[in-house]
A protein has these predicted regions:
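Structural motif
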Residues: 259-261, 373-374
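C-terminal functional extensions of proteins
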Residues: 3-38, 294-296, 303-491
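Histidine-anchored nucleotide/phosphate-binding helix
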Residues: 269-291
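Gly/Ser/Thr-rich loops at beta-strand to alpha-helix junctions
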Residues: 134-138, 263-272, 297-299, 380-385
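Non-catalytic accessory regions outside enzyme or core folds
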Residues: 2-259, 444, 449-491
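Short, flexible loop/turn elements at secondary-structure junctions
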Residues: 147, 264-268, 296, 414-417
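Conserved structured core elements
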Residues: 48, 137, 241, 271-275, ...
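Residues at the starts of beta-strands that form the adenosine-phosphate
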Residues: 259, 287-291, 409
């Protein structure tokens, strides 16, 4: 087969040549309903990712370090060549393991989360320990974890983020959009309507081309008023579930605790849009504090890490545009006054596990979340982990698919980029499929889903229920069903 070139979401050119698979266990057809996503199914996005996208991404990592070699030599001296060679060799080996569908290997280096990973890998049933036979979530997370381990175990490059330039470029090329959004969102009054618009802007920024097209304006159009926000109405025709009212009502309820946990997704422009929303929330007392949960290591190309947060704020503070620079300074103040904080980094977010096991596998993190008013999970990967990477009936209720994971009230905001979805009206998924067979991977459709927690019945394993319901009067509610969309915003 002749090589084909496609451009991935970060603009990388990826060769999609296929080599012969030695895997005899693959199945024709798409992933069946009520199964885990997996590279076993040849008509799935998981298969395409493992067969074509991941080798391409690994090739790009190789090119990045090789191209950076002169700069690295200048910084670290000639000895860094040895690191680069070892990293390149290790990535080539990993490509080969993936191509031959080899068993996952244990971690033996300096990885701080190696014990958790090794325990997880050895508990997987043997037939589910190879790239194409495993659940896609396990295989994909394992690949990103292995890639960073090569850097982590090197002498000079243990902090090297091989994706940082992509996140930075994404922000830099979004300058015009950032200016418009910044101007349009200064001093917005506290209304549901404004919150709703900001939520939708934020959602659509998870669809990666947004910064290039969605908010472009002609010269004659006003660039600094609320009409800019009204533009989002044009692009949310394809919002399949919209629980924004429930999210607003959750934040508006009186109660002692107004912390919001924000489980971040991508850096670059998406993080800028996240901050616009979060700034609005703290400025208007919709949250007393926001805790950003970022990734401990470079992850899924564009995911946000602590250095990305620092770089972004610093970039804005020193921007020549006055409005962006003022915004950067304001956000720096929100961070130094701890209105917005970076939560202690947890390796659970860069583990392979779905969120319903968090209570058993990372009780500390689970406890942190129980201590907040609302946890917002942003993006497709977080959604997959909430759903357990499982093909539910598309009309199944969000609350059911969480499989008991309800440390606090939960909101998921994501554009649909893989075959996992729930909470849709009966028949909608079939209609969408008839009209557009790529609807589940295009990122063109979105969901904002919400469910409240049942604090009063929540106990940690081996403990009495230690969360007293009287501490949560406003949050103790009957189980919520699927949202009807007919709710009225408080206030
Ligand atoms: O940035 P997001 O929204 O989490 O998207 C990442 C997702 O995109 C993909 O690359 C394609 O679905 C998946 O690997 C992953 O779930």
């Amino acid at each position: 087969m002749s090589p084909q070139i496609r451009v991935n979401k970060m603009g990388w050119r990826i060769s999609t040549h296929s080599e012969r698979s030695t895997n005899t266990d693959l199945m024709e057809g798409p992933t069946p309903r009520h199964s885990l996503l997996s590279g076993r199914y040849k008509q799935s996005f998981a298969y395409l990712t493992l067969r074509s996208r991941m080798p391409g991404i690994m090739q790009q990592v190789i090119m990045r370090v090789v191209n950076d070699l002169p700069m690295l030599e200048e910084k670290f001296g000639e000895e860094v060549r040895k690191d680069v060679k070892q990293i390149v060799d290790a990535i080539e080996r990993l490509k080969m393991e993936l191509n031959r569908d080899r068993q996952f290997l244990q971690f033996h280096g300096n990885e701080p989360d190696k014990a958790e990973w090794n325990a997880f890998l050895s508990e997987l049933p043997r037939p589910k320990r190879t790239f194409f036979r495993a659940c896609w979530l396990h295989a994909e997370c394992y690949l990103y974890r292995r890639i960073f381990s090569f850097f982590e175990n090197s002498r000079f490059l243990h902090n090297f983020d091989c994706f940082d330039h992509l996140k930075q470029e994404d922000l830099i090329i979004s300058e015009e959009t950032m200016k418009i959004l910044a101007k349009a969102t200064r001093d917005l009054p506290k209304t549901f309507d404004n919150f709703h618009k900001l939520l939708r802007i934020n959602l659509w920024c998870n669809h990666f081309e947004i910064q290039l097209g969605a908010f472009t304006f002609t010269e004659e159009e006003p660039q600094n008023d609320i009409n800019v926000l009204a533009k989002v109405a044009d692009i949310d025709r394809v919002l399949l579930v919209n629980d924004s009212v429930l999210v607003w009502n959750c934040l508006m309820k009186p109660g002692p605790n107004g912390i919001v946990d924000y489980i971040c997704d991508n850096g670059g422009f998406e993080f800028f849009a996240d901050m616009v929303l979060l700034e609005y929330m703290v400025d208007n007392n919709l949250a007393t504090q926001v805790r950003l949960h970022v990734k401990a290591i470079p992850w899924y190309i564009s995911d946000l890490t602590r250095p990305d947060v620092e770089w972004t704020i610093n970039y804005l503070v020193h921007h020549e545009d006055e409005c962006l620079s003022a915004l950067g300074k304001k956000w720096a103040r929100l961070i130094s006054s701890e209105k917005i904080v970076i939560a202690p980094v947890s390796h659970f977010w860069t583990g392979p596990q779905p969120y319903f096991v968090m209570v058993e596998s990372d009780i500390e993190l689970y406890r942190v979340l129980t201590n907040s008013r609302l946890a917002i999970f942003k993006g497709d990967l977080n959604y997959r982990k909430l759903m357990g990477d499982y093909i539910w009936d598309s009309a199944e209720e969000f609350i059911t698919c969480l499989r008991g994971f309800r440390p606090t009230n939960i909101c998921a905001m994501r554009t649909v980029k893989c075959e996992v979805v729930c909470g849709l009206p009966e028949g909608m998924a079939d209609t969408l499929l008839r009209n557009d067979h790529t609807w589940m991977i295009s990122g063109s459709y979105g969901v904002i889903q919400y469910t409240d927690s049942l604090k009063c019945s929540c106990a940690f394993p081996g403990e009495e229920n230690n969360i007293k319901s009287e501490h949560w009067p406003a949050l103790v509610q009957p189980r919520s069903g699927r949202s009807t969309g007919a709710q009225t915003p408080i206030g």
